[in-house]
């Protein structure tokens, strides 16, 4: 009888622990989906390499706007928070790759003197800071963006082929 009670306690403990892990994974996935929604809703901020806006990391402006740069800082902070959380609860090769892909367009900002000396990095744990440093030093580059239409510019029609 005592053995059955101990087994039940162990089983209950394992179930509670697994439920907590599942909840953390679900929260991390939702946070990641939110970063993707933010990227979709803010194309100027989501990928500076597309040159949809003029980023000045020294002056801390985007298209001359300090306010837009502040939004960019919050955008990047959201990506970093989601990245740290997802890598903590799901440290898989696939998530590692996905996070690196999302961070790569922000490499110049993340390596900028301003960001490196801002104190922002101190809010992240040592494991994530080490991951970030390694990811940003990776010489592999994200492939160049496709020839995309610029927002607000007239669209050119494709020429007919004979």
Predicted regions and their residues:
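Alpha-helical transmembrane segments of integral membrane proteins
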Residues: 1-8
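Amphipathic alpha-helical "stem/stalk" segments
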Residues: 14-162
């Amino acid at each position: 009888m005592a053995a059955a009670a101990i087994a039940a306690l162990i089983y209950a403990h394992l179930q509670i622990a697994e439920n907590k892990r599942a909840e953390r994974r679900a929260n991390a996935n939702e946070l990641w989906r939110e970063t993707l929604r933010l990227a979709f809703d803010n194309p100027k901020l989501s990928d500076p390499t597309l040159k949809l806006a003029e980023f000045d990391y020294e002056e801390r402006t985007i298209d001359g706007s300090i306010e837009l740069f502040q939004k960019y800082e919050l955008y990047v902070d959201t990506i970093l928070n989601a990245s740290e959380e997802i890598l903590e609860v799901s440290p898989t090769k696939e998530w590692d790759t996905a996070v690196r892909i999302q961070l790569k367009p922000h490499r110049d900002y993340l390596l900028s003197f301003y960001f490196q000396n801002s104190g922002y990095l101190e809010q992240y744990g040592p494991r994530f800071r080490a991951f970030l440093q390694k990811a940003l030093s990776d010489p592999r580059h994200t492939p160049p963006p496709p020839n995309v239409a610029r927002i607000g510019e007239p669209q050119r029609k494709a020429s007919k082929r004979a």
